[in-house]
Amino acid sequence: MKKILYSILIFLLILLNFSTVCADDVDNEVDFEDTIEVTASNVSELPKTNSRRYIVYDRISKSMIIGKNEDVKSAMASTTKIMTTIVILEKADLNEKVTVSAKAGGTGGSRLGLKRGDKASVRDLLYGLMLRSGNDAAVALAEHVGGSVKEFAELMNEKAIELGLTNTHFVTPHGLDDANHYTTALEQWIMKLL
């Protein structure tokens, strides 16, 4: 069953990495309908971007072709839930029942609408975490596996160290802003490769 959930997680991550953007073609410099094949020799021909940080990588060799500020620490927001899911899948049984605490039920941001005393399986909460970006599900799962959000964040940091992520630090399971909760574009890419 964990293999199925891992497959769903990978599929969702792929979907989350693609955004559709529509805009009027003002200057006809680049036809975004065409696929741009990027190689080390034509990197300078890439369209200009206003992104503060990014990486372009070869998904076959799993190597970076070019990056911009790829090692600069910044907030990771809801992509935090990738590591939350990894730790939950390693530490919990999908059929375990979780009782929602007052803290989980009162978590802000995007929510499933869980309330104190609600009961749900780890599996159902993971679906809510990854499909609906449920911050309340993230806290409920963190408390269930780690005993508290703080202890669960330590499990996330241990996993990050195990993966060699030296510029990543977790404070929460959901990614709501905290100055000590950060990663880099490069290390975020590494997490997505799992």
Predicted regions and their residues:
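Sec-dependent N-terminal signal peptides of Gram-positive bacterial secreted proteins and lipoproteins
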Residues: 2-23
